Amino acid sequence: MTKIAEKSKQEYGDLLKEKDHLQDMEQLEMTIVSIQTPYPSIVRIQGKINTLQPELWQAPNLAIRLIVSNPPEGQPISRVYTVRSFNPINAQIEIDFVKHEDLSPAMEWLNSAQVGTKIGLIGPRPHFIPNFTAKKHVVMFADDTAVPALYSILKQWELGISADIFIESFEKDIASQLPELEHVKIHSFHKEHHTSQKGLLLKAAFALEHYENITIWAACERNEARALRQFFLEDQQLNKNDVRIAGYWRDGVSSSELDKLRAQHYQEHIQQGKTLNEYDDLDLAN
């Protein structure tokens, strides 16, 4: 590893420890109590956490950082995942992993995980939910990586709010385990494995019947997320508070490399005197 790479890795680890980044998050240990495969491409892990603040874990769309590797030299390697659910009675959380063929640090850990395995984590960090305050029709876009976020949001859905939810997935019945709610319609787009087909969510956005009195929530691949944001903010001129979009991963870029780019961008952000609450990950040019 070059000195530049070492410096970048060290700076990233330091950034994760800063007060602005940690805020009210806990640094905990999770013990796996169950491993299931609800779909061929998804592994669901249930783990018990030793939280002293269970109230922090009951909000929808919470993100955590799992310490998937602790190399003898250098910084721990971590990955961000969404908490699908939290049970306050037994302090257990559910996390879904989308399986990949490459042996990334996360997949190596997942392949070795078994009941009783312990892993460190940092969290939870609340991520955005749809803008329910104006009582507008909600339109949501998600790929496989965002289905746990969808699940947690639907479990705490605002009464009386209508929605159309578009899901792009490798699994034909991905919506079968999502809560069924009145006035909420789910549209699933099945994507074959190893296909080069892209942009299904963006095409769905282009095909909406109207763009008045709607509010947007989306989480998917970064390039598509950025295109969705541009379409709704610039082309349709929706209010920024009604366009809540996140890019969870980037096609062709490893999570390690993406984390480095995010760290550099976040460092520039805080050097300008800004805070985490003002940070928009999709402003990252790469």
Swiss-Prot record:
Q: What Gene Ontology molecular-function terms does this entry list?
A: nucleotide binding; oxidoreductase activity
InterPro entries cross-referenced by the UniProt entry: FAD-bd_9_SIP, FAD-bd_FR_type, FNR_nucleotide-bd, SIP_C, SIP_fam
Pfam families to which the protein is assigned, alphabetical? FAD_binding_9, SIP
> Which keywords accompany this UniProt record?
FAD, Flavoprotein, NAD, NADP, Nucleotide-binding, Oxidoreductase
What EC numbers are recorded for this enzyme? Answer: 1.16.1.10
Query: Which reaction(s) are listed as its catalytic activity?
Result: 2 a Fe(II)-siderophore + NAD(+) + H(+) = 2 a Fe(III)-siderophore + NADH; 2 a Fe(II)-siderophore + NADP(+) + H(+) = 2 a Fe(III)-siderophore + NADPH
- Main EC class of this protein? oxidoreductase
- Specify which residues bind FAD according to the UniProt entry for this protein: 79-80, 82, 96, 98, 100, 102, 104, 106, 250, 252, 255
Q: Which cofactor does it need?
A: FAD
The record ties this protein, via Gene3D superfamilies, to: Nucleotide-binding domain of ferredoxin-NADP reductase (FNR) module, Translation factors
Limits of the FAD-binding FR-type domain: 25-131
Q: Does the keyword GTP-binding apply?
A: no
Q: Which family does it belong to?
A: Belongs to the SIP oxidoreductase family.
Role, per record: Ferric-siderophore reductase involved in iron removal from the siderophores after their transport into the cell. Interacts with the siderophores acinetobactin (Acb) and preacinetobactin (pre-Acb) and catalyzes the reduction of the ferric iron bound to the siderophores to ferrous iron, resulting in destabilization of the siderophore chelation complex and entrance of ferrous iron into the intracellular pool of bioavailable metals. Can use NADH and NADPH as electron donors in vitro, but the reduction rate is very slow, suggesting that NADH and NADPH are not the physiological partners of BauF.
Subunit organization:
Monomer in solution.
Q: What is this protein called?
A: Ferric acinetobactin reductase
Q: From what organism does this protein derive?
A: Acinetobacter baumannii
The taxonomic lineage of its organism, from the top, reads: Bacteria, Pseudomonadati, Pseudomonadota, Gammaproteobacteria, Moraxellales
